[in-house]
């Protein structure tokens, strides 16, 4: 079973309150999502491998640690996941960025892929999938499966707000994918919105309805 980490740092929780507020406009919403994503990135990357090397400081020769192991990749789920990219890139600017675009078939209600662009060496990278909301888990599960189908084997899912139903759905479909969230809300309403949630993250990021 995958691990679920709730990142409850005080700064994250404060900023999360601000994006939940219906009176927060798109400009501030975008800035806050970027800031929360960056803060979450510290925990998401906590297990990156290090190796010891020898360097010259202005004073002497010393041993120091540097990143090693797998290269990193960021994969936002379009469109709302785009709002989280810049915050993560501020921490890991060398990461490559892929994209997964999905829409829901009006007849079957199943997610359908309309765009996937990933690094060619995706099988060699640790991928961080970004989506602000983990509601039913349908979009996240589909995106993760599309990524796996192209060779990825090391994937983490990062969301701002989640609910028990979405977490359970991802854990059942992808028990090898660890999940990082800033909050686990109560439930879903009849329209599959997270309650209390923050509304439609994509609309609030981009000022659409």
UniProtKB/Swiss-Prot annotation:
The enzyme's E.C. designation: 2.4.2.9
One of the GO BP terms on file: UMP salvage
Keywords, in A-Z order: Allosteric enzyme, Glycosyltransferase, GTP-binding, Magnesium, Nucleotide-binding, Transferase
Needed cofactors: Mg(2+)
A Gene Ontology molecular function term of the record: uracil phosphoribosyltransferase activity
Pathway: Pyrimidine metabolism; UMP biosynthesis via salvage pathway; UMP from uracil: step 1/1
SUPFAM superfamilies (alphabetical): PRTase-like (SSF53271)
Catalytic activity: UMP + diphosphate = 5-phospho-alpha-D-ribose 1-diphosphate + uracil
Cofactor binding remark: Binds 1 Mg(2+) ion per subunit. The magnesium is bound as Mg-PRPP.
Keyword GTP-binding attributed: yes
Keyword Metal-binding appears in the UniProt entry: no
Binding residue positions for uracil: 194, 199-201
Parts forming coiled coils: none
A Pfam family it matches: UPRTase
Residues annotated for 5-phospho-alpha-D-ribose 1-diphosphate binding in this entry: 79, 104, 131-139, 200
UniProt record similarity statement: Belongs to the UPRTase family.
NCBIfam families for the chain: PRK00129.1, upp
Function field: Catalyzes the conversion of uracil and 5-phospho-alpha-D-ribose 1-diphosphate (PRPP) to UMP and diphosphate.
Protein's name according to its UniProt entry: Uracil phosphoribosyltransferase
Organism: Alkaliphilus oremlandii (strain OhILAs)
Taxonomic classification: Bacteria, Bacillati, Bacillota, Clostridia, Peptostreptococcales
């Amino acid at each position: 079973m995958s691990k679920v980490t709730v990142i409850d740092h005080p700064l994250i929780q404060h900023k999360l309150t601000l994006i939940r507020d219906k009176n927060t406009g798109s400009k501030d919403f975008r800035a806050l999502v970027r800031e929360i994503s960056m803060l979450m990135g510290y925990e998401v990357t906590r297990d990156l491998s290090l190796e010891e090397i020898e360097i010259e400081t202005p004073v002497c020769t010393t041993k120091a640690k540097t990143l090693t192991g797998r290269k990193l990749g960021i994969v936002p789920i379009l469109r709302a996941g785009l709002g989280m990219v810049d915050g993560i890139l501020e921490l890991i600017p060398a990461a490559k960025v892929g994209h997964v675009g999905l829409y829901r078939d009006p007849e079957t209600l199943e997610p359908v892929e309309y765009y996937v662009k990933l690094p060619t060496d995706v099988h060699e990278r640790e991928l961080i999938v970004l989506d602000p909301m983990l509601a039913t888990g349908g979009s996240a599960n589909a995106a993760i499966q599309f990524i796996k189908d192209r060779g990825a084997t090391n994937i983490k899912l990062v969301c701002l707000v989640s609910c028990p139903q979405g977490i359970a759905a991802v854990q059942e479909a992808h028990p090898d994918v660890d999940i990082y969230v800033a909050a686990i809300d109560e439930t879903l309403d009849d329209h599959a919105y997270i309650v209390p949630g923050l509304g439609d993250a994509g609309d609030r990021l981009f000022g659409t309805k």
